[in-house]
Amino acid sequence: MNTNESEHVSTSPEDTQENGGNASSSGSLQQISTLREQDRWLPINNVARLMKNTLPPSAKVSKDAKECMQECVSELISFVTSEASDRCAADKRKTINGEDILISLHALGFENYAEVLKIYLAKYRQQQALKNQLMYEQDDEEVP
């Protein structure tokens, strides 16, 4: 899926009816388009928090910088996810997994990120297995 597909706003009668008839005016079309684009982005507060945690405590971040970063990281996520989705479709699968993301990062030229995420994914899976094991052991102890 490319970015134009996700931003497309149809003005067909069916879509106009689905949107409560509001899509007929150009102002409403603009609002619907903006909402759809906004829905694709990460919440600005989350982006701002990540930026703040990365920068020195005395650093200030402008609203424009936050909005720019919000759009950039959201586009990157969409780009990688789209590549992973295409891979899943080619394999006739419906669920994107961590390996799909890693392969997509490599395919898109983000090898450095893929290597770091591969390590993170292995550690995450290891912790999840340990957590599941502990929960299983607790369940065994509670059974009389």
From Swiss-Prot:
GO terms for biological process: positive regulation of transcription by RNA polymerase II; regulation of carbohydrate metabolic process; regulation of cellular respiration; regulation of DNA-templated transcription; regulation of transcription by RNA polymerase II. GO terms for cellular component: CCAAT-binding factor complex. It comes from the Eukaryota. It is found in: Nucleus. Residues 9-31 have a biased composition (Polar residues). Gene3D superfamilies: Histone, subunit A. InterPro entries: CBFA_NFYB_domain (IPR003958), Histone-fold (IPR009072), Transc_fact_NFYB/HAP3 (IPR027113), Transcrpt_fac_NFYB/HAP3_CS (IPR003956). One of its GO terms (molecular function) is DNA-binding transcription factor activity, RNA polymerase II-specific. Residues 1-31 are annotated as: Disordered. Keywords: Activator, DNA-binding, Nucleus, Transcription, Transcription regulation. Residues 42-48 bind DNA. Residues 69-80 are annotated as: Subunit association domain (SAD). Belongs to the NFYB/HAP3 subunit family. Component of the CCAT-binding factor (CBF or HAP complex II), which consists of one copy each of HAP2, HAP3, HAP4 and HAP5. The assembly of the HAP2-HAP3-HAP5 heteromer (HAP complex I) occurs in a one-step pathway and its binding to DNA is a prerequisite for the association of HAP4. Acts a component of the CCAT-binding factor, which is a transcriptional activator and binds to the upstream activation site (UAS2) of the CYC1 gene and other genes involved in mitochondrial electron transport and activates their expression. Recognizes the sequence 5'-CCAAT-3'. Present with 2510 molecules/cell in log phase SD medium. This is Transcriptional activator HAP3. It comes from Saccharomyces cerevisiae (strain ATCC 204508 / S288c) (Baker's yeast). The lineage of its organism: Eukaryota, Fungi, Dikarya, Ascomycota, Saccharomycotina. The gene is HAP3.
